[in-house]
Amino acid sequence: MIRRAHTSDVPLIKQLVDTYAGKILLEKNLVTLYEAVQEFWVAEHRGVVIGCGALHVLWADLGEVRTVAVDPSVTGRGIGHAIVDQLLRVARELQLQRLFVLTFETEFFGRHGFREIEGTPVTTEVFEEMRRSYDIGVAEFLDLSYVKPNILGNSRMLVVL
């Protein structure tokens, strides 16, 4: 079952993220996860959280898929795909037109229609406004130089909804 995350899920989300931190996901502090809990959806099986993913709104027409993680003991069963499908549904409900993801998992996201992109697909005016954000994910989307060490090897992908 895919459902909205609860604050009580945050320690379990942290455990999932920690499994992949420094490999395919950036490390997340508990406070960061609590601050963003309303963006998260979780996969639950028999009362246990086995996967997570978040949808973060970047701009009026643009969102980002973040922090998709599945318990290694249940990978390959479509759980990650179910989470991303839910995030795509929510993005459409919010009337977002495009979703961005920064990922090593290009084949996985490609199955959901994401395509690799170069550059930052926003106007100069929007770029300048987005630069004011304190969110590190926005800086990664904008490809700002101070986040380059965090994103080396990742692919920038976008899907039009």
Which residues are covered by each model-predicted region?
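Conserved active-site alpha-helix within GNAT-family acetyltransferase domains
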Residues: E93, Q97, T103-R131
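Helix-loop element at the rim of GNAT/NAT acetyltransferase active sites that forms part
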Residues: R4, L16-K28
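A short beta-loop-alpha structural element at the N-terminal edge
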Residues: M1-I13
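Conserved acetyl-CoA-binding loop-helix of GNAT-fold acetyltransferases
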Residues: V70, G76-R89, F100-V101
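C-terminal "cap" of GNAT-fold acetyltransferases
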Residues: V122-L161
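A conserved beta-strand-loop-helix scaffold within acyl/acetyltransferase catalytic domains
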Residues: E27-R46, I50-V70
